[in-house]
């Protein structure tokens, strides 16, 4: 059954706003929802709890939340249009609160527009912004900013939209008008700025488009890349691209716990099964028509 949750001004337990940008399921199976008017928590699938940002940050500033993450060690990260908020929580309340923003002397960030927050296999946290990629240094609680280029210098991760680490430990970065960049993590952290691999919309091994919205890894380790109205699947062993499917608009892309890939567009949801065999550009899949736009899934 599908349950539709909406804001109701008469009900304190309803979600605070009907514009939902992000959702996240934590290790206790609570569902956290980021909206235009704050954060909600659905505890054990029974009700939402509204938490206003000022209760966490002790500030009257707002933040339209587009990305959320709880790390494996329990840290919380929330980012959107006004920087990045970090905190931990225990019985005494919210601890270690830091708000990373442009021009902040205490906690500077390369850009206030946060697109993605990601924890890699080593437990390191990466943040994609409209001015490159940031790496969180836990020892100093500061960010290191990276902008990666292709060998020609024409394309870069200046507008970074997504990041992930593959099973070989390499870092994959997707950017607006830049394509996909791949390089060794240690080399990136050492200061190297030229990608080992780069994918654009040109050449024989091209993506379907240059604007990369999202990237996810399936259960076989393949990297799925969304470019507006198409999906691409990259084999990490031979680095070959297969253009998978046409769609209305690829609004959201995610992998489930079994490694299947889920895609939401303006009218439907499609699941590409990780166990399916690849025959040309045909993948085993199933589509459900829902008749409305998919903004996020979790």
Q: Would you name each region that the model predicts?
A:
Residues 1-298:
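Carboxylate-rich, polar loop motifs that coordinate divalent cations or form catalytic acidic clusters
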């Amino acid at each position: 059954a599908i349950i539709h949750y909406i804001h109701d001004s008469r009900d304190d337990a309803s979600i605070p706003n009907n514009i939902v940008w992000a959702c996240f399921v934590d290790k206790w199976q609570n569902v956290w929802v980021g909206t235009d008017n704050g954060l909600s928590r659905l505890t054990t699938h029974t009700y939402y709890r509204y938490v206003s940002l000022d209760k966490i940050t002790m500030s009257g500033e707002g933040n339209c939340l587009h990305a959320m993450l709880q790390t494996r060690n329990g840290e919380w990260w929330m980012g959107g249009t006004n920087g990045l908020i970090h905190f931990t929580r225990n019985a005494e309340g919210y601890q270690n609160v830091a708000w990373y923003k442009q021009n902040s002397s205490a906690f500077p960030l390369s850009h206030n527009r946060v697109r993605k927050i990601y924890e890699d296999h080593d437990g390191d946290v990466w943040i994609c912004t409209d001015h490159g990629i940031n790496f969180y240094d836990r020892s100093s609680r500061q960010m290191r900013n990276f902008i990666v280029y292709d060998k020609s210098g024409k394309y870069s991760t200046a507008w970074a939209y997504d990041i992930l680490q593959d099973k070989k430990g390499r870092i994959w970065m997707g950017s607006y008008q830049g394509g996909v960049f791949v390089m060794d993590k240690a080399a990136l952290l050492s200061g190297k700025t030229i990608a080992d691999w780069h994918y654009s919309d040109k050449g024989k091994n091209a993506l379907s488009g240059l604007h990369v919205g999202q990237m996810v890894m399936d259960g076989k380790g393949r990297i799925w890349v969304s470019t507006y109205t198409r999906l691409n699947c990259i084999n990490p062993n031979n680095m070959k691209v297969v253009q998978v499917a046409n769609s209305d608009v690829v609004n959201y892309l995610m992998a489930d716990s079994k490694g299947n890939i889920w895609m939401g567009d303006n009218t439907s949801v499609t699941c590409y099964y990780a166990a399916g065999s690849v025959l040309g550009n045909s993948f085993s899949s199933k589509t459900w028509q829902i008749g409305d736009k998919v903004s996020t899934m979790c």
